[in-house]
Structure formats: structure tokens, C-alpha cells
Amino acid sequence: MAGELRIMENKSREDINLSPVSKIEIYSFFDPFSSDCFKLSAILSKLRIEYNQYIRIRHILNPSLKVLTKCQAQSTSNFDNIALAYKAAELQGRVRVERFIHLMQNEIIPKRDIITESMICDCIQNAGIDLEVFKDDLQKSKLTESLKIDLHIAREMEIEQAPSLVFFSEDVHEEGLKVEGLYPYHIYTYIINELMGKPIEKNLPPKLETYIQQQQLVTMEELLTIYEWPEKLLNKELKKLAIQQKIEKLKYPDGDFWKSKMPKIKSK
């Protein structure tokens, strides 16, 4: 897993007028078609579970020419353009849009599927997003303007690839740290601890069945990242849940997935 750790100059955040917060702010630039971004999403989920009180993650679909060209090539209209769909979903809240893109990546990456309007609509509804409001928002020109703002942010932070994370402490005069590419989990926790500058306590993950119920569809790699159990033990627990008819195993070209058969937990 290759990547580059690089210190950013503090002007990058000040120039785009981002307000400081009382915790570490992480900007995550992603490509919805990238398998590395898909893998990083599991790491970010674990970071949010363990360090929720210390971090705030903002996801930005990397609006580079390469990514937007892929989005356009996959689409026939606004209704199946993943970049515009993401910006429209974003208008209904951070939690919902994150669940939406998680569901979409679960459709795109393992199945190697072409994006369709029905796929987007299914993921929108499963993410707890109002479908009619979403469709109305898709027709608004402000989505294009929002993408331009994201492009400006990416340029100011000198984002050249996805995935890329940029870490900021609460002090706008402090330098940010940019991490390009995919790294082991402990690299990200080290950065968080260094930026906090004091001992911090980690939260424990939820019960296995609760996490799967929240996410609806998960990879084996994701669960191994979240729980850090031996694979044999994790398989044993998954089989127990399958016997109880709470989950089912799905096989895709890029590996095995586990799908929840329990009622989904509604987004707040």
C-alpha cells in the first residue's frame, strides 16, 4: 500500500474560509470507482467508531477531470450521474449521504456494475433520503456550482489523487497534514493522537450484528478492519448470525459480502 505523507502550508485552509472546529477535521477526497477508496471507507468507519468525540470527517467526491469524466461516461442523464447524485444527496445531511455513497460503492466495486437510475434510487431510499426531494434537487444548477467549490478546495489543498485525507487541528494557524494513498490503520491513529497532543480514549465497536444492520452490506475485509478479530473467529460469529437468519452471505467477483436480513436502522 503506497502513499505519500506530506505537510501542507496553513494557507490552504484559510484561503477557502473553513471555520475551525473543536476537534480534528478530516477531509476525505474519494473516487467512487476506486477500490482503494472503497477499502479506505472501512478504515474511516473504524476511526469514526473509536474516535468519534475527537474527529469530524467531511467526504468530498474528488472533482478532478479524470473522476468527472468517468462519472459522465457512466451516465445518460443527471439521474444516473454519481457525481451529481452525491451532491443532491448531500443536501439531506451528512449521515444520509455517507450511507448513500457506502451503498453505492457496495454496488459498483464488488459487482463491477454500471451505474443505473434504478440503482441510485434504491440506494437513495435505503439511505433514508427523501426520493422526491432528491429528484427535485438533481435538476438544480446549484449542484454544478457546488462541484466547482469542491474543485476549488481540492486545488487549494493540492489534491492529486484519490484517496487523499487532509487532517487539521482546531487551530487554523497550524499546518495541515495530507496523506495520499492507502495506509495501514495505525498510521491514521498515530496522526490523530499527535494532533490531539494529549492522551485520548478509544470507544469500542458496536455488536457485530448491530454494525451489519447499520451498514446493510459489508465486506469481510471491512469487518476484519473494524473488529480486529482472527478471521477464524469472525467467520464463526458470522455463521452464527446466518443460522439465526439475521444475515446472508453473497459471493461477488471481488470477494464475499455479508448482507443484513434485519430491518435497517433509520438514519437520524
Curated annotation (Swiss-Prot):
Adapter protein required for efficient degradation of Spx by ClpXP under non-stress conditions. Interaction with Spx stabilizes Spx and exposes the C-terminus of Spx for recognition and proteolysis by ClpXP. It comes from Staphylococcus aureus (strain COL). Pfam families: Thioredoxin_5. Belongs to the SpxH family. One of its GO terms (cellular component) is cytoplasm. It is found in: Cytoplasm. Keywords: Cytoplasm. InterPro entries: Adapter_SpxH (IPR046404), Thioredoxin-like_sf (IPR036249). This is ClpXP adapter protein SpxH. Interacts with Spx. The gene is spxH.
